[in-house]
Amino acid sequence: MKTATRKADSARASAAKKRAAPKAAAKKPARMYRTNLRDVPKVGGLKRRDGWVDMQVQFLIDKKSAGADHVVGWTVLKPGARHENHRHHNCDEFFIVLKGKGHIYTENGEQPSSEGDVVYSPRTCWHGFNNTSNEDVVLVWGWMGAGSIEASGYEVDPATH
């Protein structure tokens, strides 16, 4: 009788193990990513028809370089350069004006912007920047929730073209 009970207990224990949720696969350890502006190539192929007018853009951190699900970028806008009104369907954007001044495009028209301004634009909100000064404008910016321009859902405002 004891043998039959042991066999039944063993069978129940074996079935319970099979029903138990499998252990989560071990995640790769996180790795820090570091780069330098001098080492990151400028983005080529940015087209005026897509709202990129005379801009120097670098993707410092993104999916391709760091496996990130966001982008951190650096942009220099020469006098007269602008990033036309645009929006992102799949991510939020922020930018910080490190140097220079110009105008921010908003859903309510243009507003002046200068060194030290920090701007946040939630997904689908139209925004842009125009360098109206005689000096370079330098921006640090980021897309939160998309690791590439393709993933961001970028759309230029057809009304500006």
Predicted regions: what they are:
Residues 84-86, 104-105, 121, 127-133:
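Short beta-strand His + acidic residue motifs that chelate non-heme Fe in jelly-roll/DSBH
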Residues 73-88:
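Conserved short histidine dyad/triad with adjacent acidic residue
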Residues 90, 109, 125-126, 135, ...:
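A generic "binding-loop/recognition-motif" signal
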Residues 108-123:
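Short acidic-glycine-tyrosine-enriched beta hairpin
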Residues 2-69, 84, 153-161:
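A short, N-terminal "cap"/entry segment at the start of jelly-roll beta-barrel domains
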Residues 90-92, 96-102:
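Glycine- and acidic-residue-biased ligand/ion/polar-headgroup-sensing regions
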